Amino acid sequence: GLLDVVKGAAKNLLASALDKLKCKVTGC
């Protein structure tokens, strides 16, 4: 349902944010 879509989007945003942060810290 809609909640699943929202959860999926939030998870994707969190994952990409963590990736960017990791790139800043470790230099990818």
Swiss-Prot record:
<keyword id="KW-1015">Disulfide bond</keyword>
<keyword id="KW-0964">Secreted</keyword>
<keyword id="KW-0878">Amphibian defense peptide</keyword>
<dbReference type="Pfam" id="PF08023">
    <property type="entry name" value="Antimicrobial_2"/>
</dbReference>
<keyword id="KW-0929">Antimicrobial</keyword>
<dbReference type="GO" id="GO:0042742">
    <property type="term" value="P:defense response to bacterium"/>
</dbReference>
<comment type="function">
    <text>Has antibacterial activity against the Gram positive bacterium L.lactis.</text>
</comment>
<comment type="similarity">
    <text>Belongs to the frog skin active peptide (FSAP) family. Ranatuerin subfamily.</text>
</comment>
<feature type="disulfide bond">
    <location>
        <begin position="23"/>
        <end position="28"/>
    </location>
</feature>
<dbReference type="GO" id="GO:0005576">
    <property type="term" value="C:extracellular region"/>
</dbReference>
<keyword id="KW-0044">Antibiotic</keyword>
<dbReference type="InterPro" id="IPR012521">
    <property type="entry name" value="Antimicrobial_frog_2"/>
</dbReference>
<protein>
    <recommendedName>
        <fullName>Ranatuerin-2AVa</fullName>
    </recommendedName>
</protein>
